């Protein structure tokens, strides 16, 4: 905390991408107090990411949430807990793996809407007839964070050709 108070925006952005957000975070009132990236564009101190998105009355949406439900565990080196079988999101740490049933429940609410036991009626992205594209969890082993490039990955011919070109144009 650096002592800076952010004034809420009057209207939401069209792009509601929030780094670090997990599926269930999109419905938590006041999530900006937990995530400084969302705090910068939340419309109120008690706003939800989904609520701000729905305030735009979307006719088309893209929704790619879920990667952080497992990715934070993977990128932290396995520091966290696999919460499979534990539906209590209040017990989850930042690097914990979200229970698959919890993920399914929240993802369904985000897209289709419904009733949440604590947050009440939730209007989902597709509930008012909006069309969209959805994505969920990529294979974490295929993301750039876990993809290695071997030492000296360029073929010798390419290196020699590049050196010749540099010499030709006086850069070497």
Predicted segments with their positions:
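Short, intrinsically disordered, charge-balanced linker/junction segments flanking boundaries
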Residues: 106-118, 170-172
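A taxonomically broad motif for mature regions of secreted/extracellular
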Residues: 63, 105, 120-123, 127, ...
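Conserved nucleotide-sugar donor-interacting segment of glycosyltransferase catalytic cores
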Residues: 45-50, 116, 126-129
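Acidic, Ser/Thr/Gly/Pro-rich low-complexity segments that form flexible
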Residues: 140-172
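Conserved SGNH/GDSL esterase-like catalytic core that processes O-acyl groups on lipids
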Residues: 1-106, 141, 146
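Alpha/beta-hydrolase-fold catalytic nucleophile elbow
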Residues: 64, 135-136
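Loop/turn elements at helix/coil->beta-strand transitions in domains of secreted/extracellular proteins
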Residues: 56-61, 126-132
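Feature captures the catalytic ectodomains and active-site-proximal regions of enzymes
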Residues: 111, 122, 126, 130, ...
